[in-house]
Regions:
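Bacterial N-terminal signal peptides
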Residues: 9-17
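Sec-dependent signal peptide cleavage junction
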Residues: 18-32
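Positively charged n-region of N-terminal signal peptides that target proteins for export
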Residues: 1-10
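Short beta-strand/loop segment at the start of cytosolic alpha/beta domains
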Residues: 30-61
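A structural signal for leucine-rich repeat
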Residues: 150-151, 196, 216-217, 239-241, ...
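Structural signature of tandem-repeat unit edges
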Residues: 46-54, 63-80, 92-121, 131-144, ...
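Acidic, Ser/Thr
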Residues: 61, 85-91
Length: 326
């Protein structure tokens, strides 16, 4: 059974009364499609994959390379989907909490995964329990990642959405305890429930319209989080169980979009930064939100200050994949 919640009693308390916001829909314009960055790396041979031409879906990876570069086409048919079972060969159940007959070493230790821009959809949990997976470079402008795509990938460190992503769905990186870098182009419509639950993130810049309940719950190493402007809904339980948090930076946010649910963090040292041009009335409202959620214990913890980050550059992909000899 997947560990969706950190502790039952905690989440019963946290989630009581929470309404999950309706997903925002967004279409990709033709101009945006034309501007896509194409995957520059040579794909693995077509015969390394079982492929259903009718649905344009990869149904199984049967190759032996631990660094997997998905082809754009197989038999001249575009690769658009990846099924749930496609990477069953790379799932490590031995080092999970699941009952299994699998023996040590009976899985492919996939290290690096590169996805082409032709992909449109990947089924829920398609890479769950791929514990050896360290790096994912996604060129596909996915409208939705779907749920639990990389949940419990314990070795996952770096994920880059080169052409952006529409929605980062529930439990996307839940329990990816070694995850340090997640980068995406532009603004996402939604960061789902427990999307980054119990990850190893230490500093994080978030550019999103909607941030759902418990989005960052239990990220014990997270010290600093920057929320970009343009947020339309922020559920305060996103900050639950951030025991090491030092700074929450709001780079321009309307207090009315903050859902002040009970968090009970009661952190006496965290600083909440708001822009210098925040009015006294807005400052008071933001303070009330954090205080009523029991995130802070002293009103002086909410302060005006400089917190606007410069543009967050995309990590050096060539350098990252070069470590795998790609």
């Amino acid at each position: 059974m997947k560990k969706r919640i950190l502790t039952l009693l905690t989440v019963i308390a946290i989630l009581a009364g929470i309404a999950v916001p309706v997903r925002a829909e967004e279409t990709v314009s033709e101009d945006a499609v034309e501007c896509l960055t194409e995957m520059p790396y040579e794909a693995l041979p077509e015969e390394d994959f079982e492929f259903d031409e009718d649905s344009r879906t990869i149904t199984a990876y049967i190759g032996t390379s631990v660094d997997v570069i998905i082809p754009r086409t197989i038999g001249d048919v575009p690769v658009e989907n990846i099924s749930y079972n496609a990477f069953e060969c790379a799932r490590d159940y031995v080092h999970s909490d699941m009952a299994t007959n699998q023996k040590e070493g009976e899985w492919l230790p996939m290290r690096c995964l590169i996805l082409p821009e032709t992909l449109k959809s990947i089924e829920d949990s398609a890479f769950t329990h791929c514990h050896d997976l360290e790096t994912v470079i996604c060129y596909a402008p996915l409208e939705n990642t779907n749920k639990g795509l990389f949940e419990e990938c314990k070795g996952l460190k770096t994920v880059i959405f080169v052409n952006g992503v529409g929605e980062m769905d529930n439990y996307l990186f839940n329990y990816c305890k070694n995850l340090k870098t997640v980068w995406w182009k532009g603004k996402v419509n939604r960061i789902g429930v427990q999307c980054f639950g119990a990850t190893g993130l230490e500093q994080f810049c978030v550019n999103a319209k909607n941030i759902d309940s418990c989005a960052f719950i239990g990220c014990e190493d997270l010290k600093e989080i920057h929320i970009r402007s343009g947020v339309e809904n922020l559920n305060m339980t996103a900050f639950a169980m951030l025991t090491g948090i030092e700074t929450i930076c709001l780079e321009g946010i309307d207090p009315d979009v903050m859902e002040a649910d009970w968090v009970n963090l009661q952190n006496s040292t965290v600083t909440i930064l708001v822009p210098e041009d925040t009015t006294d009335e807005q400052l008071q409202l933001v303070t009330q939100k954090f205080a009523s959620a029991y995130i802070i214990i002293n009103k002086s913890q909410v302060q005006k200050g400089s917190c606007q980050l410069s543009e967050n550059p995309m990590p050096d992909i060539d350098g990252i994949v070069g470590e795998y000899g790609i």
